[in-house]
Swiss-Prot record:
Gene3D superfamilies: Crystallins (2.60.20.10). Changing residue 5 to P: In CTRCT2; reduces protein-protein interactions in vivo. It comes from Homo sapiens. This is Gamma-crystallin C. It comes from the Eukaryota. GO terms for biological process: lens development in camera-type eye; visual perception. One of its GO terms (molecular function) is structural constituent of eye lens. Has a two-domain beta-structure, folded into four very similar Greek key motifs. InterPro entries: Beta/Gamma-Crystallin, Beta/gamma_crystallin, G_crystallin-like. The gene is CRYGC. It is linked to Cataract 2, multiple types: An opacification of the crystalline lens of the eye that frequently results in visual impairment or blindness. Opacities vary in morphology, are often confined to a portion of the lens, and may be static or progressive. CTRCT2 includes Coppock-like cataract, among others. Coppock-like cataract is a congenital pulverulent disk-like opacity involving the embryonic nucleus with many tiny white dots in the lamellar portion of the lens. It is usually bilateral and dominantly inherited. Keywords: Cataract, Disease variant, Eye lens protein, Methylation, Repeat. The modification S-methylcysteine is found at residue 23.
Amino acid sequence: MGKITFYEDRAFQGRSYETTTDCPNLQPYFSRCNSIRVESGCWMLYERPNYQGQQYLLRRGEYPDYQQWMGLSDSIRSCCLIPQTVSHRLRLYEREDHKGLMMELSEDCPSIQDRFHLSEIRSLHVLEGCWVLYELPNYRGRQYLLRPQEYRRCQDWGAMDAKAGSLRRVVDLY
């Protein structure tokens, strides 16, 4: 089970809201979010209600201001607890509809370019576990939560283009 607390002000000040479950709409509980404490679990935060907009992966720890989770603003409007699994495995494809060169991963990959000599991934198949795809190397830039399923084109995971820099398994490290 996970537990996360949102605070309206920096350094864990101001009005707060605590949850242990997915929340499709956080707007009734706070108007802005400037700090977060994750007591347990891994959470994906979204800048808009109903799991839309920019995504931010947070693991157990303290985030005294929104820059600590690479936030672009103090807007957090929905969140979901990411289920934990023991094993992780996914397949990357250079073309849409799972065509072209296929590569398989079971560990974090800080640079897709260095490892596979690709800067774009056109389709994916997540076989086990949840992953986060980052648009830039070293786990930077826009983030996309990938659950076990087939993604036939980049729009299926919410991206506007196929730019892919790094991949990380969602694992609660504690």
